[in-house]
Amino acid sequence: SKKTLEKTHIEKKSLNTKEKIDIAKKACSLIKDGDTIFIGPGTTLEQLALELKGRKGYKIRVITNSLPVFLILNDSETIDLLLLGGEYREITGAFVGSMASTNLKAMRFAKAFVSANAVTHNSIATYSDKEGVIQQLSLNNAVEKFLLVDSTKFDRYDFFNFYDLDQLDTIITDNQISPQHLEEFSQYTTILKAD
């Protein structure tokens, strides 16, 4: 099999698990009854799906291009679920490409939750340009735009810049973020630290 620079889903799942749970809990607390939301691919966002699934008394609609997110939520009785189809990227479990893009363009969300591999200066980056394009579209079509990243992602680089930080409403990260990073990235957008 060909070697890749991109970490696999399994590799990512075991990294910074506590931080991801904290971030997911914080994000979950911002989702209101009746919201229509987009959840992108990534292990932090899968954790958000788990938090949503365990929540009682809320009826929401979730659109996702992540097969793992879909599989977490597909037997929930309180979540209307829509999976965007398209070209499948096995390494992250995401559907991408023109079919996913075309469907996404017609949709609007109260909130979009995406993740990234790297946050540097005023930009957010990921390894795959195809995944980046889908994340970009979902953010463009959302009233409120959220980036969920653990504190190890700041001042990191990756291949494809898909959004500017100052176009986001909020970054949700863990409480291990350094004071320097908090100060630096707060000039672009609001940073919420998980409890």
Tell me what each language-model feature is:
Residues 1-41, 50-57, 74-78:
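HTH-adjacent hinge/linker in prokaryotic transcriptional regulators
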Residues 15-23, 65, 96, 130:
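Short secondary-structure boundary/capping elements
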Residues 34, 57-59, 142, 168:
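A general structural motif
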Residues 37-38, 62, 127:
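Conserved SAM-binding loop
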Residues 41-43, 117:
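Short, well-ordered beta-to-alpha junction loops that form the rim of enzyme active sites
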Residues 47-51, 184:
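A short acidic, amphipathic alpha-helical/loop segment
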Residues 67-195:
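Conserved phosphate- and dinucleotide-binding cores of soluble alpha/beta proteins
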